[in-house]
Amino acid sequence: VPKPYAMLKNSIMMEYIGDAGSAAPTLSTVRLTRDEARPLFDRVILNLNLLLGNQRIHGDLSAYNILYWEGDITLIDFPQVVHPEANPSAWIIFLRDVTRVCQYFKAQGVKCDGRKLAAELWTAHGHKVVKEVDPSQLDAEDPKDRKLWEKQKVGK
């Protein structure tokens, strides 16, 4: 996570990742070697585990919200952060974060079962895996959210 320097109202000034010539690219624009992919995947999962251990879920994690610079990663964009005990859809949101991370890293050659990994991390922190999606937490315009809702309706 970039180091925060100042805060005013709903804005936080944070550390710049990059150099004078360019900002760090998002991981979504980077093709990793197999040797690079696994350690970076492990680093992302470590960060997810640390967040969860501090009662936080990123809420919108994907390769678009991870910066890549000089062989390292930095998670960014935290306005959707969720408390796992306070949000009825916390498990589904966490599962979505882990699944998106796994989708990117699978394309980079890393073997990953997003659902299994998310459940392991989730339950290791004392949370229960739930099957229900709280419809108030879904975006009707988002095809991924509609798919989640449809899948849940079929399962009933």
Briefly describe each language-model feature range.
Residues 22-33:
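AlphaC helix of the protein kinase catalytic domain
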Residues 53-63, 68:
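Catalytic-loop of the protein kinase fold
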Residues 84-115:
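Active-site activation/catalytic loop segments of kinase-like enzymes and analogous catalytic loops
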Residues 65-77:
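Conserved protein kinase catalytic/activation segment
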Residues 1-23:
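Conserved ATP-binding subdomain of kinase catalytic cores across diverse folds
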Residues 17, 77-82:
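Activation of the activation-loop gatekeeper triad in protein kinase-fold domains
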Residues 74, 104-156:
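Regulatory N- and C-terminal appendages and interdomain linkers associated
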